[in-house]
Structures are given as C-alpha cells and as structure tokens.
Amino acid sequence: MKQKHFVRVAIAMALIAGYNMPAKSQVSLDAYYNVDWQLNMPINDYVDKASGWGMNFDAGWYLTPDIAIGAFVSYHTNNQYVDRSVVNLTNETAVYTDQQRSLYQLPFGVTALYRIIESDWQPYVALKLGAEYAYMSSYYYIYKSSADTWGFYMSPEIGVRWYPWANGMGLHAAAYYSFSTNDGTVMGQNMDMPGNFGFRLGLAF
C-alpha cells in the first residue's frame, strides 16, 4: 500500500510540474528532469523474475550544450516463489519448506550524461555511479528471514527524450544495465554482486 501511495504522489507531482512549466519556446535546455516507471529483470541467484514494481527519478544540469552532470535515485522490488525443498539453515538445522523471496533495491548517486542531439528529440548516453542499498527477505510458513546489504553501484544507460508539446513537458524512454557489489545470504541462498537489465518509460521536463 505504501508503494502504491508513493507512486500516486510522484505521478501527481510530475503532472503539476509539467503543467506549470513555461511555453516550449521559453523552456531552458540547460537542465533536465525525469520521472519514470521502471521494468527490471534481475540477474542473480537469489531472485531472477522480472517485475514492473519500480520508479526512477533523475535531474541534471548541462555544463556544455552536450555534457551534463546530475543526480539520481530509483527503487525496485522483485519477487520470486521457490518450491518446497530442504533448506540448510545451519550445519545442524534444516527445514523443508517453500519460500516467497523478495529483493528490494535502492540505488542513488551521480550521473554523467552526453546528449547526442539538441532538438525536440534528444538521444543520449549516460553513466550512473553511486551506492545501492538492497534488502533481501524470504517468507516461509509464518516466519521471515532477511538481510540488509550495501554496495557500490554502476549503470550505463541509453535513452531519448522527446518534447512534442507546447508546454515543454515531454516523454522519456531508456534502457539500462546495472551492477552492484552487494553481497548477502538469506535461507542458505547467497546473492553476490547482482546485476539488472531494465527499461524506463516516463515524463521529461
């Protein structure tokens, strides 16, 4: 419920910001802002099922007509059901159970961006560097096991912003790969240096 409420608030804020922007001819190309829905496919041994439970927020400022620096934060949750099996909790303890695994990722940091074309269509390439908080959890029977992890985060991205409307609000689409150094173990299953492929679609300002 908290995730859904957060998404509604973020979308409402984005629409209000776009409505209050000046006419397109007056929009400054010295900065950019994105609010995106995110589809994510994790690459790790703990959770590997794709989901659309994520969002991304970007802001940046152009140092030259082509090169920008900025900041980002995003979050994503991926879930996976695991059939019944014997899980060794310790050297002397084991349990036979199924699991509902969940992986929540929250990366944030700085962005370096190169804008290929400065026009209504603005394709770009970017590199994001920062830190990632990842929360691993597993529900079984009426119990829950979890682990908090931190790591270094890196993500190359390719995308495009399109500004078709007179109010200066546009559309944003991007594809990305991400990698982090997070490492954790829950219910005997290790997650070591997880990666992700994903796609973002949202609003650009």
Question: Residue spans of the language-model regions?
Answer:
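Cleavable N-terminal export/targeting peptides
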Residues: M1-S28
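Short glycine/proline- and aromatic-enriched beta-strand/turn motifs that initiate or cap beta-hairpins
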Residues: M21-L63, A68-I69, A204
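Residue-level detector of the transmembrane beta-barrel scaffold of outer-membrane proteins
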Residues: S28-N34, A68-G70, Y124-A126, G170-A174, ...
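Outer-membrane beta-barrel pore domains and translocons
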Residues: N34-P42, S74-H76, K128-E132, Y176-S180, ...
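Outer-membrane beta-barrel translocator domains and adjoining extracellular loop/strand segments
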Residues: I43-S51, Y81-N88, Y135-K144, D183-N190
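Transmembrane beta-barrel outer-membrane domains
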Residues: Y46-G52, Q99-Q105, S145-Y153, N190-N196
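Gram-negative (and chloroplast) outer-membrane scaffold detector with strong preference
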Residues: D58-Y140, G151-M154, W162-N167, F205
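Predominantly the C-terminal beta-signal and adjacent terminal strand-loop region
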Residues: T77-R84, Y96, G159-F205
